[in-house]
């Protein structure tokens, strides 16, 4: 390669686009990783508080909080307001994430829902059978719903800590299975454990949801209106005797998601430019409206509610419900209690068994038409970590059991959480001991993902660096004036050095509304390409992003010993404009709005653009091709999935 990049440049591991607009799943997982620690700390505090001063603990959560309007009054204790009020927002976040996966993620191809759906059902039926085997014929058999759920937040957090790095497919699979559990649990909570059911109130709630659908179909986008309807639905469901947390899940599932359109982003940029020239309250409102319109309601609501749900609501729920006096009598009773043993074995043994057996049967009976997006070691790991029922299990337990049986169930849930975490650590520890190629296959599998790149790579048309017939292709949509493309360039160079059997493709996406010289720089690259020097010009342009005026471009052409008259003529006639416009159209088809955007074997790469993240994506792609990622040397173990090496810090 020609052209040198400035040395010593520090760069963020994530572009502004990635950190602000896209990759909700990665942001979701990052939040859950941190919130898992807060949740566990809250559980420890609750246990300590209850054992040091049980009376103050119960007294606080037993206080009554009432809402009264005229002759109407809603009165419940604080624990109810946490369990059925604030937890509604937690289930709203879960519903939002499911809907996003349906609209933009793996589940937009509906057949991919089959295996995780059946795996989730298997992970419910086997634990129920184990619990009932311990409690058959006893009054505590009514607590069978306790062992159904997976605590999505804590399970994702534990997987981030205990599982392999850079495996979004693994986390996606866990999220889908866990959400299937949660959906069924919410239905069971509404049907099997209602309190004083009121059909009239349920009909009112159904009418409100129907109104939400009508407004949504008509294109209504007024957020406060949806909020008022959500509150009304919550009150109606609460009066019906059904746990109103179901409202959050339903409202989340009804909130559509879509990728930001480049036209909307350009419109927002135009409005901001007008505001910059003539600041006024009217234009300020216009700018806010434009920015809001560029993002889907799903993205906006996740941004608002997810941190609150993760760092406040779920820990507060644990604080209100985990507190149980652990004394010798309770431990002795729990050691032989059918409730405790049923919960423990259902989660630690039943969950992984149900998920693994169901996945195996679906794959075998469908002749691998329905195959998990991950390998079998990862499926086992998802099964074991799904045994963390914690938050949702406690929620069901408070509805299904009372008195000593409830305390025994809480002990079982706590012990099962520890047991499931330990078995998950063991599974991935054993997987890490496999040889690199087998480890990648065991964790990542060989299932093909959805192709996000709508315009396939054409070696006769595209600008290709590397072997034309390489098994793995990395495509970048870039802008020569975009500073983040310049910051990602060293990682791309290192990637091509580390992996000799990949091809790299550059496609143009000049963001002309914010980068005034991006278009002419792209045309200069095409003019150089007309003389066989596209990549040399590409390297120079990214190395000198602040110097892209026409005179600078002519200087680069002269440095590359190009025919200057031919170069000038190419630029003057704008011969490269059509080619660039075709790349931009392809970007629109693939829902690409920002730069840099990478695709690895047709799948969009989300998140960081440092060498570690890109190498992991390439390694994952090679696992699907059954070929070696490097054809001339042993694999670099630092880059392998499951490596014990620490992550590279952003900016290093």
Swiss-Prot record:
Molecular function (Gene Ontology), one example: sodium:proton antiporter activity
Database matches in InterPro entries: Na/H_antiporter_dom_sf, NhaA, Thioredoxin-like_fold, Thioredoxin-like_sf, Thioredoxin_domain
Reactions catalysed, as given in the entry: Na(+)(in) + 2 H(+)(out) = Na(+)(out) + 2 H(+)(in)
Gene Ontology biological process terms in this record: regulation of pH
Domain Thioredoxin: 428-623
Region Disordered, annotated ranges: 626-652
Membrane topology according to the record: Multi-pass membrane protein
Region (Na(+)/H(+) antiporter NhaA): 1-427
CC terms in the record's Gene Ontology section: plasma membrane
Alphabetized UniProt keyword annotations: Antiport, Cell membrane, Ion transport, Membrane, Sodium, Sodium transport, Transmembrane, Transmembrane helix, Transport
Record carries keyword Membrane: yes
Coiled-coil annotated residue ranges, if any: none
NCBIfam families reported for this sequence: NhaA
Function: Na(+)/H(+) antiporter that extrudes sodium in exchange for external protons.
Protein family according to the UniProt entry: In the N-terminal section; belongs to the NhaA Na(+)/H(+) (TC 2.A.33) antiporter family.
Name of the protein in its database record: Na(+)/H(+) antiporter NhaA 1
Species of the source: Salinispora arenicola (strain CNS-205)
């Amino acid at each position: 390669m020609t052209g040198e990049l400035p040395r010593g440049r520090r760069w963020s591991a994530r572009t502004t686009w990635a950190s602000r607009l896209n990759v909700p799943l990665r942001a979701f997982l990052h939040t859950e990783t941190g919130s898992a620690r807060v949740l566990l700390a809250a559980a420890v505090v609750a246990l300590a508080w209850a054992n040091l001063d049980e009376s103050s603990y119960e007294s606080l959560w037993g206080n009554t909080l009432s809402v009264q309007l005229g002759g109407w009054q809603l009165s419940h204790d604080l624990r109810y307001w946490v369990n059925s009020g604030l937890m509604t927002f937690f289930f709203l976040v879960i519903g939002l994430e499911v809907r996003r996966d349906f609209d933009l993620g793996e589940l937009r191809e509906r057949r991919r829902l089959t295996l995780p759906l059946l795996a989730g059902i298997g992970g419910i039926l086997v634990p129920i059978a184990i619990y009932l085997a311990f409690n058959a014929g006893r009054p505590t058999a009514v607590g069978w719903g306790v062992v159904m759920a997976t605590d999505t937040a804590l399970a994702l957090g534990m997987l981030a800590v205990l599982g392999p790095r850079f495996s979004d497919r693994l986390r996606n699979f866990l999220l889908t299975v866990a959400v299937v559990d949660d959906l069924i649990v919410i239905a069971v909570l509404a049907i099997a454990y209602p309190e004083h059911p009121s059909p009239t109130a349920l009909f009112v709630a159904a009418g409100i949801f129907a109104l939400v659908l009508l407004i949504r179909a008509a294109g209504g986008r007024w957020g406060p209106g949806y909020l008022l309807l959500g509150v009304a639905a919550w009150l109606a469901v609460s009066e019906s005797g059904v746990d109103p947390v179901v409202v959050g899940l339903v409202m989340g599932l009804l909130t559509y998601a879509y990728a930001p359109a480049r036209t909307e982003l350009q419109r927002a940029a135009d409005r901001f430019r007008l505001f910059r020239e003539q600041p006024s309250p009217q234009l300020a409102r216009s700018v806010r409206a434009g920015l809001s319109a560029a993002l889907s309601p799903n993205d906006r609501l996740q941004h608002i509610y997810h941190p609150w749900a993760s760092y406040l609501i779920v820990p507060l729920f644990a604080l209100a419900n985990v507190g149980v006096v652990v004394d010798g009598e309770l431990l002795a009773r729990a050691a032989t209690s059918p409730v405790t043993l049923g919960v423990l074995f259902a989660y630690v043994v039943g969950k992984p068994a149900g998920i693994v057996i169901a996945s195996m049967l679906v794959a075998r009976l469908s002749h691998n038409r329905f195959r998990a997006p991950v390998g079998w070691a990862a499926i086992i790991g998802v099964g074991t970590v799904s045994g963390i029922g914690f938050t949702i299990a406690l929620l069901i337990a408070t509805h299904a059991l009372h008195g000593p049986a409830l305390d025994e169930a809480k002990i079982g849930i706590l012990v099962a959480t520890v047991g499931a975490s330990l078995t998950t650590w063991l599974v991935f520890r054993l997987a890490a001991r496999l040889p690199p190629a087998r480890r990648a296959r065991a964790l990542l599998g060989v299932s093909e993902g959805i192709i996000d790149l709508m315009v396939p790579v054409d070696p006769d048309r595209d600008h290709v660096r590397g072997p034309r017939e390489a098994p793995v292709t990395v495509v970048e949509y870039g802008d020569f004036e975009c500073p983040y493309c310049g910051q990602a360039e060293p990682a791309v160079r290192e990637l091509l050095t580390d992996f000799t059997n990949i091809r790299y493709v550059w496609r143009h996406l000049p963001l002309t509304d914010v980068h005034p010289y991006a278009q002419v720089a792209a045309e200069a690259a095409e003019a150089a390409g007309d003389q066989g020097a596209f990549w040399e010009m590409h390297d120079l342009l990214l190395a000198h992003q602040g110097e892209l005026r026409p005179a600078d471009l002519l200087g680069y052409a002269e440095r590359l010993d190009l025919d200057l008259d031919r170069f000038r003529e190419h630029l003057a006639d704008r011969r490269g404009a059509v080619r660039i416009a075709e790349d931009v159209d392809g970007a629109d088809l693939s829902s690409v709005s920002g730069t840099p955007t990478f695709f690895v074997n047709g799948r969009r790469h989300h998140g960081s653009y440092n060498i570690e993240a890109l190498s992991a994506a390439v390694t994952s792609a090679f696992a699907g091709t059954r070929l070696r990622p490097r054809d001339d040397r042993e694999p670099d173990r630092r880059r392998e999935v499951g490596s014990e090496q620490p992550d590279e810090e952003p900016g290093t």
